[in-house]
């Protein structure tokens, strides 16, 4: 992944951020192709991701930058950042350390709808979120 300042500025100029200054980012395992999660990025988090090659997102609920894995240790090393044809969605190809999902699964897409409409777990639990983040009160 090229991280020159000119390349970063070029990408930031092409991305179509929404009215809140955000763009959706789909995150995919670089080896398996498995979709791990979807998160939001703003200009600052995208620039930081390109610079450090570690995924950084924007938390809409906390209204702050969110370095993926900062609390849990489940970091995402970024190999590639792709942009879709409309310029309004990103795809990050990453090496995921541990689970990507905050509830402990490898992927945030850990539930599958069955024919009868129920949900079944279809992924691996990687960690206990209470041990990593503490109990919610």
UniProtKB/Swiss-Prot annotation:
Cofactor annotation comment: Binds 1 Mg(2+) ion per subunit. Binds 1 zinc ion per subunit.
Gene Ontology terms describing biological process: L-histidine biosynthetic process
EC code(s) of this entry: 3.5.4.19
Pathway recorded for this protein: Amino-acid biosynthesis; L-histidine biosynthesis; L-histidine from 5-phospho-alpha-D-ribose 1-diphosphate: step 3/9
Protein name stated in the entry: Phosphoribosyl-AMP cyclohydrolase
Main location: cytoplasm
Protein's organism: Chlorobium chlorochromatii (strain CaD3)
Record-level GO cellular component terms: cytoplasm
Record has DNA-binding as a keyword: no
Gene Ontology MF: a single term: magnesium ion binding
């Amino acid at each position: 992944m090229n991280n020159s300042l000119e390349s970063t500025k070029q990408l930031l100029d092409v991305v179509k951020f929404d009215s809140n200054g955000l763009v959706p980012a789909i995150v995919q395992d670089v080896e398996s192709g498995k979709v791990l999660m979807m998160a939001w990025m703003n200009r600052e988090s995208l620039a930081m991701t390109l610079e450090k090659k570690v995924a950084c997102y924007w938390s809409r609920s906390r209204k702050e930058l969110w370095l993926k894995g900062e609390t849990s240790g489940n970091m995402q090393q970024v190999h590639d950042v792709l942009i879709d044809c409309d310029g309004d969605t990103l795809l990050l190809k990453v090496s995921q350390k541990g689970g990507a999902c905050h509830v402990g699964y490898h992927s945030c897409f850990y539930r599958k709808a069955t024919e009868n409409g129920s949900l079944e777990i279809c992924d691996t639990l990687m960690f206990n979120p209470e041990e990593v983040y503490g109990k919610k009160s």
